[in-house]
């Protein structure tokens, strides 16, 4: 009997960028800049984009702003690029409504985070995601587990019970461990496409069955992120490891404080005036900004 494992599909490609939300000088969403940035990210190697997720500051965006942002990005990149909308909420009715609206607005999928703050039990999580899946059966869903932010973690057995929902096709693993990927594959099989939610864990997660990454660093090093993933998948682990080790300083700098504070500063330093995060997040402090600038300079070709 061959020990070869079945590989998962890639419903949204290998490299997705979790987009920042640009704000203008008055703090309003800059839709024109969002469109230009989206196009740039695709040109730099992203297969698809996620709008209104954690990096996109969804907690401080109104539903109207999120809808406008999805429309602007969708128009900017055209029909050939998957665009996922963050539609999660800790209220099931709100998440259902947002997911239906995203489907109607032309999203190619929805990123749906586990409910935060109210800490539902596993049975509540199952009911929550089942209601969302049934409300928009034509829209592929990516479940999103990030317990460090939400206060609850979705167990692999719970995800496995949801595999009868045909539109639950993928999972963003952001618990900070490779064990989550293994446990999900053992519980759900190869049907579920697992994406790393941590830039620094992409390479080890690929080795245990993840199919790609929802990346923050790809705002700045999209081609290198893509090269790392492709090198590993094409049987060049040493090349992939070389990319990984070169990028570790950037990965650390981008998560030296709360995301997306550093990546917005990095984009500003790179000529993209995306503005500061909305309160209660703050701009990156001067010392960290100087260190980030040095990290970016070290990555530039000489």
Curated annotation (Swiss-Prot):
Give the catalysed reaction(s), semicolon-separated.
L-aspartate 4-semialdehyde + pyruvate = (2S,4S)-4-hydroxy-2,3,4,5-tetrahydrodipicolinate + H2O + H(+)
What main location does UniProt list?
Answer: cytoplasm
Its BP terms in the Gene Ontology are: diaminopimelate biosynthetic process; lysine biosynthetic process via diaminopimelate
Q: Which residues form a coiled coil?
A: none
Cellular component GO terms, alphabetically?
cytosol
UniProtKB keywords:
Amino-acid biosynthesis, Cytoplasm, Diaminopimelate biosynthesis, Lyase, Lysine biosynthesis, Schiff base
* Top-tier EC class: lyase
SUPFAM superfamilies from the entry? Aldolase (SSF51569)
What is the species listed in this Swiss-Prot or TrEMBL entry? Synechococcus sp. (strain WH7803)
Q: Which PROSITE patterns match?
A: DHDPS_1, DHDPS_2
As given in the record, the signal peptide range reads none
- The record lists its disulfide bonds as none
Describe the protein's quaternary organization and the partners it interacts with.
Answer: Homotetramer; dimer of dimers.
What the protein does? Catalyzes the condensation of (S)-aspartate-beta-semialdehyde [(S)-ASA] and pyruvate to 4-hydroxy-tetrahydrodipicolinate (HTPA).
Quote one Gene Ontology molecular function term: 4-hydroxy-tetrahydrodipicolinate synthase activity
- The EC number of this protein is 4.3.3.7
**Catalytic positions?**
144 (proton donor/acceptor), 172 (schiff-base intermediate with substrate)
Query: What is this protein called in UniProt?
Result: 4-hydroxy-tetrahydrodipicolinate synthase
Q: Which pathway does the record list?
A: Amino-acid biosynthesis; L-lysine biosynthesis via DAP pathway; (S)-tetrahydrodipicolinate from L-aspartate: step 3/4
Q: Which Gene3D superfamilies match?
A: Aldolase class I (3.20.20.70)
- Residues that bind pyruvate: 55, 214
Give its localization: Cytoplasm
- Which family, according to the similarity comment? Belongs to the DapA family.
Tell me which residues are marked as the site Part of a proton relay during catalysis: 54, 117
């Amino acid at each position: 009997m061959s020990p070869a494992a079945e590989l998962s599909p890639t419903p949204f490609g290998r490299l997705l960028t979790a987009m920042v939300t640009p704000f203008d000088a008055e703090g309003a969403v800059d839709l024109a800049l969002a469109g230009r940035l989206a196009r740039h990210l695709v040109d730099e190697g992203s297969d698809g984009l996620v709008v209104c997720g954690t990096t996109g500051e969804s907690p401080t965006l109104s539903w109207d702003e999120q809808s406008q942002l999805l429309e602007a990005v969708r128009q900017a990149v055209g029909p050939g690029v998957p665009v996922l909308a963050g539609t999660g909420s800790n209220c099931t009715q709100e998440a259902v409504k947002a997911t239906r609206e995203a489907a109607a607005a032309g999203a190619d999928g929805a990123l749906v985070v586990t409910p935060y703050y109210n800490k539902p039990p596993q049975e509540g999580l199952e009911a929550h995601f089942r209601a969302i899946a049934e409300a928009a059966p034509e829209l592929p869903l990516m479940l999103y587990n990030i317990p460090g932010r939400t206060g609850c973690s979705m167990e692999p057995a719970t995800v496995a019970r949801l595999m009868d929902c045909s539109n639950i096709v993928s999972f963003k693993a952001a618990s900070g461990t490779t064990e989550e990927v293994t446990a999900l594959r053992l519980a759900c099989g190869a049907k579920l496409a697992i994406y790393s939610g941590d830039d620094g864990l992409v390479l080890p997660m690929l080795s245990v069955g993840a199919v790609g990454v929802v990346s923050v660093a790809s705002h700045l090093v999209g081609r290198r992120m893509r090269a790392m993933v492709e090198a590993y998948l094409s049987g060049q682990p040493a090349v992939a490891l070389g990319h990984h080790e070169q990028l570790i300083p950037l990965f650390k700098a981008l998560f030296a404080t709360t995301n997306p504070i550093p990546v917005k500063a990095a984009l500003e330093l790179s000529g993209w005036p995306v503005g500061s995060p909305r309160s209660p997040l703050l701009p990156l402090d001067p010392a960290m900004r100087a260190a980030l600038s040095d990290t970016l300079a070290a990555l530039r070709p000489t």
